[in-house]
């Protein structure tokens, strides 16, 4: 199964200048909980923004340019990334925008954090047809001392 996991603000903004324009430790914990012990697939820009392999996960980076860091597996295409995951029950696609766009048609599940924030962004989550997805989990949280904005965790499964 292919799943996408993303945090998105109003207008589907997911990033600005290779970073997330908000501070939500709760979302980082949600991300870790849902990706741990699963292969994670990302584009080169996402890899560069993280700067290190995510522990407890097989890290696969899609890039047209050969990678030099042997702590991750470098592939050139979506199909190579899927093949690199072998028979893993769930592949977690973690970004960025172009990689989400390439995997969305193949995805069976979306793990989304909807952030109640209007922020400038240069990277967006792809537009998806809501009627194609069923919400199977939703959990709202108000902003607090640690989390800069209100947010809602949601899991969608393809109908």
Swiss-Prot record:
Protein species of origin: Citrobacter freundii
CDD domains assigned: DHFR
Q: What does the record give as the reaction this protein catalyses? A: (6S)-5,6,7,8-tetrahydrofolate + NADP(+) = 7,8-dihydrofolate + NADPH + H(+)
Q: Which InterPro entries match?
A: DHFR (IPR012259), DHFR-like_dom_sf (IPR024072), DHFR_CS (IPR017925), DHFR_dom (IPR001796)
Please give the name of this protein.
Answer: Dihydrofolate reductase
What is the phylogenetic placement of the source species in the record?
Bacteria, Pseudomonadati, Pseudomonadota, Gammaproteobacteria, Enterobacterales
EC numbers on record: 1.5.1.3
Summarize the protein's role.
Answer: Key enzyme in folate metabolism. Catalyzes an essential reaction for de novo glycine and purine synthesis, and for DNA precursor synthesis.
Q: Which GO terms describe its molecular function?
A: dihydrofolate reductase activity; NADP binding
Q: Which domain of life is it from?
A: Bacteria
Pathway(s) the chain acts in:
Cofactor biosynthesis; tetrahydrofolate biosynthesis; 5,6,7,8-tetrahydrofolate from 7,8-dihydrofolate: step 1/1
